[in-house]
Amino acid sequence: MGIAKVEDIIGETVRRDIGRMKRFAEGQLEAAARSILSTPNAHVGIVTGFFIRNAVPPSPETDGLGGMAHMAAALANLGIPVTVISDAPCSKAVWAVTTELPNGVALEITSLSAASVRSLRDRLSTGERPLTHLVAIERVSPARDGKPHREYGADMSDDTAPLHLLFDDPDWRRPWVTIGIGDGGNEIGMGVLPEEIVREDIPNGQLISAAVSADYLIVSSVSNWGGWGLVSAMAMVAPKEAAARLLADFTPDRDRAYLTAAVDVGQAVDDSRIDRPATPKMSVDRLSWEQHAQVLGRLRAHVDGYLADRQRS
């Protein structure tokens, strides 16, 4: 089944059926992978960080951080420059995860002001190797009211830099290809979803659903899995030697190291609910690390089998 099987694995129902969102985005995972690998002098930015004010302590959630790390590691291993981007409230956890990467990446942290984001945008579009692709993973988008919202409707404006301005801004012509990865409908990239899906499939969709689109949308049951899916898809369309480099650190052991850094050093949190604050813990979207490791292992086994079959044919 090739990359379609990857889409199936990362889109398996966990708590909420995302079937229609997944079907809407079918084929875009492969297209995004091919876009990155076919671009000469590629330079990929990765935007992440979803801040939870009522956590103890106030911190970003664990989801998105591991997916960012696996994408960054794979691309850097291939020799593609990577710039990881976040904002001040999420900076400690994002930085902590980048310290575990096998190769160095650039790290850009903005303040909460639009001016700071636009200044970064100008820098990314110039220089010796301008950005060619920008990936958002588990990064909240403003909704139609112009405000970013949590899944139950809380306004996140006071804790969220307008990093969506790297994807869309009136009277600005975007110079890079954009990819959005999300699981809940309120993340950057989900703005392409049809109104029917927003209204019927996303809890509080009329309030929280993303207004910011992306060229390619990757839908997964956990956002981290979408990042894993992109690594898998890139390996499956890459030549043999490039595939090996992309997969060199695509292992459960590395994933555990990324999550450990996020939690122990960065104080990233999970299990946030209206009536119970999130706390630092080794889980993502209320699933234990061991459960996530099983999914990563299945992806890796599928990719390895696909590449072995391709080699024999």
Where are these regions (language model features)?
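C-terminal functional extensions of proteins
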Residues: G185-S313
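An acidic, phosphate/nucleotide-engaging active-site surface
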Residues: V94-P170
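Histidine-anchored nucleotide/phosphate-binding helix
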Residues: P58-G79
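Short glycine-rich anion-binding loops that position phosphate/pyrophosphate groups of nucleotides
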Residues: G49-I52, R139-P142, G184-G185
